[in-house]
Regions:
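Short, solvent-exposed coil/turn segments at beta-strand boundaries
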Residues: 62-69, 118-124
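Solvent-exposed loop and beta-edge segments used for protein-protein assembly and interaction
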Residues: 23, 64-66, 132
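Fibrous stalk/shaft segments of extracellular and virion attachment machinery
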Residues: 1-43
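Extracellular jelly-roll beta-sandwich "head" domains, especially the C-terminal globular C1q domain
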Residues: 53-55, 79-90, 98-144
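Extracellular/surface recognition and adhesion modules
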Residues: 27-31, 68-70, 91
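Surface-exposed ligand/attachment interfaces on beta-rich extracellular proteins
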Residues: 20, 39-65, 75-93
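Intrinsic-disorder/low-complexity, polar/charged segments enriched in Ser/Thr/Lys/Arg/Asp/Glu/Gln
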Residues: 67-71, 137-139
């Protein structure tokens, strides 16, 4: 069974590039605590080593019955364009397909040429080269 704590740790460890946990009892509190810890850990809150920066102010977790929806706002911050085939991050075992349902939605800033694939081994990769400076939102829904 997946739980909020492990989802938050995955966000912190894999996407936010920090070892984070939470003691919050509500989803709003968990996001606030996660954002607070991240901002204290790095000069660039949410910055990942692989060219992805998370905007924690636009990040949310919402629980509906047996699913948790995680909405993440990213910005590409790599100095050079990220090449096609680059793995942006890897879902941990408990959150790989088919446990991730409706895995990805994007905001309007992404054109059709900037595509991603989520593979059954849990890797989330670019299909095409992506320039720096793009902002996009992805929504993942986890079963819990």
């Amino acid at each position: 069974m997946n739980d909020l704590s492990s989802i938050l740790n995955w966000i912190g460890n894999t996407i936010g590039n920090s070892a984070l946990g939470t003691t919050a009892t509500t989803l709003k509190g968990a996001i606030a605590e996660l954002a607070d810890k991240t901002s204290k850990k790095t000069a660039n809150p949410g910055r990942s080593t692989d060219g992805i920066e998370v905007d924690w102010n636009e990040t949310s977790l919402t629980k509906y019955d047996n699913v948790v929806e995680c909405k993440l706002r990213f910005r590409t911050v790599a100095t050079n364009p990220m090449p096609a085939g680059k793995t942006l991050f890897t879902f941990p075992v408990g959150y790989r397909p088919p446990y991730v349902v409706r895995p990805i939605t994007y905001d309007w800033n992404l054109s059709s040429v900037h595509r991603f694939n989520l593979y059954t081994d849990g890797t989330f990769k670019l299909v095409d080269t992506m320039p720096s400076g793009l902002t996009f939102i992805m929504t993942f829904t986890f079963t819990v």
